Amino acid sequence: MASASDARSLVELRLLDGPNLYLPRPAAKVTLDLGELLGLDVAAARDLGVELGLGNTRPGAAGSVFRQRFAVRLVTQIVRRLASAGGATRLAVRTRTGQAVNVLVVAYPWRNAGRAEGLAYGLARVLDTVTAGPQAVAEMIIAEGAALATAPLGSAPELIRPQIPVVAITGTNGKTTTARMIGHVARQAGRLVGWSSTDGVYIDGQLVEAGDFSGPSGAGRVLRHPGVELAVTETARGGILRRGVGVAYNDVSVVTNISADHLGLGGIDTLDQLAEVKAVITKITKPGGWCVLNADDPRTLAMRLGTKARIWVFTRDPNSPGGRTVLSGGGRMTTLLGGWVCVLAPGADPLQVVEVIDVPMTLAGLSRVNVENALAVTSATLALGFSVEQVADGLRSFDPNENNPGRMNIWTLPVPSGTISVVIDLAHNEAGLEALLEIMGGIRPPHGRLLLGVGTAGDRGDEVFVRLGEIAAVGADVVEIVHKGDYLRGRSMAEISELITEGAAHAGMAIQRAHDSELAGLVSLVDQARDGDVVAIMTHQDREELDRWLLDHQATRDDAGVLRTKVLRAGATS
């Protein structure tokens, strides 16, 4: 074979080590530029199709979407001919068109890196010859196929086949909280638990490696650690797209929800495409395992149709249409009945697990999103075989401030006029901000105001920042912008401020202040706060610094009793 550098049509090659968007096993993802093929005149394209076995096809006009469809068939044929020449018969080939008409993604399974790469470069070089005519293309296929047959095999995929139970968790919001709660329930029940997330790798509750390990490397670190009895793996969209899922299968998969986040990145432009990525973990759940799905999220609920596992849904509404559908099909549902977390199954009485008000993470039932997280955790841990008593004990003892740093952490802070509440939360998108505002309102006494520091990482679309500004202005009394300097990701602070300010203006608010750091924003808002106010910061990079500042200023973390008192006081007077 010639060198890889002369393959003009090849845009990108990725060897995905695990199940992925394209196949439930390791796959090569090849991104191609079909510009030359799309630019052929109709007669030349038709002759090429005939030469490659497509018959008397109609290739469509140059550059048209009809030519694109013709190109997809032609490329698939070329891949199979090259693979056959290299010794691989009946190769599974998947294709996806890009937003631009000339972009095509081709995926096929791989076992040996050398052969997989050789096939990708060979395919690109064949496409580079299309302007030379059908005979030149046919000769190039023969030459590249012969070279592929003798290419070095290379390394195998780094795919783990777990020997212990694995829970895989994904979704737009709630992944880390759900993973932490599942791990806590299991640890309280005496299991040695390893879990990986966006915060790092934890073994038996201890951080052993900090960083974002929501991809396959995190799962690998957990499963290779000696003595671990249960692996809890947070599985993010980016890891699935870049390397695939790190394990061949799981025992329980959990999908919390699907909402707009990171759209426009990695070829994922719509919610339906995002849901397709998240669904990968459900497709590798063992047939005897359980898929735990949000019954009230239509994209999540639809994942039940693509898995061989049993279905267990969760919903706050016992009359949820999605829940009824699953129950009628023999599945299970975790829901709320009479203030209790209950499990429903066909032909059985409701199984009472725990009262919602006794689950600190739900903030006395105030936090709808964390009620849903608790329902998901109940489903997953019961599916793993833990007893009702073990699950209830774990839910009751999971303290949001101690066990879930950075997520709905609530403090009481003295100020000259009395005390205020401070909420630190890793809200990073519209749904997260709405949940944060719900919590703020739920602990505010009648005379209190809501003061909010809003901001998120720069890798969101313009519309996300505008929408954050709108939501903040509608929900809070005072709004200031808090930037995340380490997470601008190509944007300037001025650009982000302009977009958020634009959104706030839609709701009739003029934002006056923007801060270079989260801490500066917290200090500014606290300086304006008076007795009974609630201050909140959307944090991303300075959580530990915020915690230190609060402790230095005599703030105390709210325990379950204090939280309940705040909620009841706000509810009794609202």
Which residues does each predicted region cover?
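A short, gly/pro- and small-residue-rich
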Residues: 247-258, 274-279, 311-317, 499-502, ...
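Extreme N-terminal, non-catalytic leader segments
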Residues: 108-164
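Walker A (P-loop) phosphate-binding motif
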Residues: 154-200, 207
